[in-house]
Every structure is written in structure tokens, then in C-alpha cells.
């Protein structure tokens, strides 16, 4: 079994089953080439309740997905959900260098939005820019190239319980897999099925 460079792997550790899915990226989209499903009850309210059985469920699902796809799985995107997930809005404000908004100013504004009080038992999962304000002009989707001296980023920050995230990460790592990213399952679903207009 070889590792294909144009392959994405997702793992969903659910309340009733653990799923590993392998997709091959093609110009027209993603073709599902492998799936592994293991019945399990490893999560409760988004939190792992037994590390050892979670590891075994992931291992079995990954082995089945490898067998079906003919690919060796070394890393995966891991879905997370549960009642411990919270969201809050934030605002990041920065001065614009050179009076023209560039990609660096966007990134600095998004980073500035993370300077909020987050309890030590929580971890940021996603920082989702909603819109931008340039010198008081609101509702801007992409301010790159615009003239201005002040940039504000209106951002939605998604956090999760640090222990829940760490237990999922630990379980996947114990199977011998690297984690590409931990992704909020609802966000992944919206990316997969909604058009750009529907997301607005």
C-alpha cells in the first residue's frame, strides 16, 4: 500500500461509532475511496470516556479504510463536537502600514482578535473572520488593496474544553497517526455541503 499525495483522511469519533474516511482529491471534487466504521461508545457529550477503547476503535476503523482504499494512512483531520464547544465574537484592531491594507494587516488583525480572556481549561479551535472595517467603513469581505489607516477584523472564535480536545488528540496519536488539524464537525459539514451564497 502506497501513500498518495492527493488523499485526505478524516476521522470522526462519535457517540455510537468511529469512522475513518479516505478521499482522493480530483479536479471535480473529492472521491471517497475508503471507509472504515467501528461500532463504539467512546464519547459522551464530546468527551472521551475510555482512552484504550477509543484507541482500539480508531485503529480498527483506520485499518478498514486503508484496506478499502489501498492507501497507507499516516495523518488525518479529526472532527470534534459536543456540548463543550462554545463560540464568541471578538474584534481585532490594527494600524495599517503604508496606508494600504495587505495580507499581513489581515493576519495581524485576526491575531489581535485572539487577545481575549479565555479560561485556562479552554482551547481555541477556530478563528473565523466574519467581516472587516476599514476606517469606519463596515461590511467589507476582502479589504486587501483598500486604502486606509485602521483595520478592524470582526471574528467568531470557537473554543473547546482543553481536556476533551487533548484526549481526542492523544487517542489518535496513540494509533500512530499525525493530526493535520482538529476541526469542528459542524464547520466541516458546512464546508462540504453549502455553496458560498448559502454560507453568507
Predicted segments with their positions:
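Nucleotide/phosphate-binding catalytic cleft detector across ATP-hydrolyzing
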Residues: 1-15, 21-200
Amino acid at each position: 500500500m502506497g501513500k498518495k499525495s492527493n488523499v485526505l483522511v478524516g476521522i470522526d469519533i462519535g457517540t455510537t461509532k468511529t469512522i475513518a474516511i479516505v478521499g482522493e482529491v480530483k479536479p471535480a471534487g473529492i472521491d471517497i475511496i475508503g471507509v472504515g466504521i467501528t461500532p463504539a461508545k467512546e464519547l459522551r457529550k464530546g468527551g472521551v470516556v475510555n482512552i484504550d477503547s477509543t484507541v482500539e476503535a480508531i485503529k480498527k476503523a483506520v485499518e478498514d479504510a486503508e484496506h478499502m482504499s489501498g492507501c497507507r494512512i499516516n495523518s488525518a483531520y479529526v472532527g470534534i463536537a459536543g456540548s463543550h464547544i462554545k463560540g464568541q465574537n471578538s474584534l481585532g484592531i490594527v494600524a495599517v502600514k503604508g496606508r494600504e491594507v495587505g495580507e499581513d494587516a489581515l493576519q495581524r488583525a485576526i491575531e489581535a482578535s485572539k487577545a481575549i480572556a479565555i479560561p485556562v481549561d479552554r482551547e481555541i479551535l477556530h478563528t473565523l473572520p466574519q467581516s472587516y472595517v476599514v476606517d469606519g467603513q463596515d461590511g467589507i469581505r476582502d479589504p486587501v488593496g483598500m486604502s486606509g489607516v485602521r483595520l478592524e477584523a470582526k471574528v467568531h472564535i470557537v473554543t473547546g474544553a482543553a481536556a476533551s480536545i487533548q484526549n481526542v488528540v492523544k487517542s489518535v496519536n496513540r494509533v500512530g497517526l499525525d493530526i493535520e488539524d482538529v476541526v469542528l464537525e459542524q464547520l466541516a459539514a458546512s464546508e462540504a455541503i453549502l455553496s458560498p451564497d448559502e454560507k453568507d
